């Protein structure tokens, strides 16, 4: 039951613009009623597209975010719930993400890369110390909190508490940044985040992921075998130390891969200009007092109108590959658009209540796939299911040829059901084959690289992926998570 059934999110916030959309949610910009200058991102999740299992995913996201207080992790303030929606009040980050920064300004020099990586590794260290694995670290989920290089890690829709002794089994994430143990259908642990960090470091220096191909099956095989190399034309620009760190992070054997603490102790990270790093940290100070940590924007109002929000109850979930068909995605997306237009035009006509419950421990042996994404390119918004969800569980099958065949079949089938909702004018048209011919100082990723950022769900020997059909993904609006 809501802790305050007489209060609505619209009692505290004026919702203005839609700034991001996803399969199950819409993100809007809002300001606080009493402090107009304070802006927030409101993530509105429609219950019309949430079944019980997907609701559990939302509970996990809220539970993890509510426990995170770190300068390099997006802030979560409170949440509200009504019969129609679940609303998360989040920090608004207006300066774009890492992908857009590379596209607009080109690759980083080593000092810029060092500042970004130390901040990212600091966030990952914080999560790993709390037994949380993020599972979807990629440029689109790394947000710039200021113009000094300060970053925030966002989008915790796939994050999960886990036990190191048990590990995780069901694969999810984004293919171009996924570790070999995921594509090989192996039990994996927090080291998958370190692999993703290695891909990020490579990306910001060379303008593309280490594993990239227009052919999805080829990219899958490259990751599985761990086959990559430094670009011959540009690798000379960077020190042996940074290339050594990349090699250690992109180690195929997860047991030999650097941990986050080892990465922070690496010579290249340790050689950072502490004055520069300190100036970045000052731009996004860590909340220290317990009172500040628990204070929500709504608490700025009088006590009679205050609203509390605690973590919802978490329930164990059976192993699940959350797959939706293209038609279901199209329907859900249209419903979300209609639903949120209604919200924007008549925001005070409905009441949303703060949700309150106690968190419980989730059975770590039960694994889930969370498709609660809201990315601004629609290759990340839907997962096409062309296989029966009740397929036989061949747990010992690691036949990569079968995996690749399934991957290709899903790609071909989805080409016939492709749906784009971004404007053609927003497309970046640069041929990936011409990447090596771009001037070294201005090398930038093509927009087609967004096609590599697809959520995947792998269970045992089955490969399921969201594929756009067109290799050039059209760019959408800024998503703050």
From Swiss-Prot:
Cited Pfam families: Pkinase
Record domain Protein kinase: where: 13-269
InterPro entries associated with the record: Aur-like (IPR030616), Kinase-like_dom_sf (IPR011009), Prot_kinase_dom (IPR000719), Protein_kinase_ATP_BS (IPR017441), Ser/Thr_kinase_AS (IPR008271)
Catalytic activity: L-seryl-[myosin light chain] + ATP = O-phospho-L-seryl-[myosin light chain] + ADP + H(+); L-threonyl-[myosin light chain] + ATP = O-phospho-L-threonyl-[myosin light chain] + ADP + H(+)
Active site (record annotation): 136
Residues binding ATP: 19-27, 43
Disordered: region residues: 285-315, 345-427
Keyword ATP-binding: yes
Compositionally biased spans, kind Low complexity: 379-421
Keyword field contains Kinase: yes
SMART domains: S_TKc
Key words of the record: ATP-binding, Kinase, Nucleotide-binding, Serine/threonine-protein kinase, Transferase
GO terms under cellular component: cytoplasm
GO biological process: protein phosphorylation; signal transduction
GO molecular function list: ATP binding; myosin light chain kinase activity; protein serine/threonine kinase activity
Activity regulation field: Does not have a calmodulin-binding domain.
Family: Belongs to the protein kinase superfamily. CAMK Ser/Thr protein kinase family. CaMK subfamily.
Role description: May phosphorylate a specific serine in the N-terminus of a myosin light chain.
Name this protein carries in UniProt: Probable myosin light chain kinase DDB_G0284661
Record lineage: Eukaryota, Amoebozoa, Evosea, Eumycetozoa, Dictyostelia
